[in-house]
Amino acid sequence: MKNEVILNKISTIERCIKRIQDVYGNDPENLEDFTKQDSIILNIQRACEASIDLAMHIVAGKKLGLPQSSREAFDLLVTAGLLSADLANKLKAMVGFRNIAVHDYQSVNLDIVRQIIEKHLTDFKLFT
């Protein structure tokens, strides 16, 4: 059962990355299309949530502590030697982006979305 949860989260992350890449198509102008923009942002959000779920699952399974936030789950993985601090910081930044996108704290900066697509989708893959 535990491996099934892990495999499911990894599959979700991979599916989201593929969807983002398909919709973006290596063309920043695709971010000007609101439908494509929504699809991309939603899939970044889903990949982030699946990464958080995966981190929480590993933390619970290995009894690494009780994280008080999703960001802290990544910190506990670093402390346990299961994740590099550099990758943890990148994933925690994704959590910040997710919070902006989900809770609409401020409008989403499309330059940040483009940078995530072009430079940071691999961070999700490295985590899986």
Regions found by a protein language model. Name each.
Residues 1-128:
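Solvent-exposed interaction patches of small proteins and small membrane subunits
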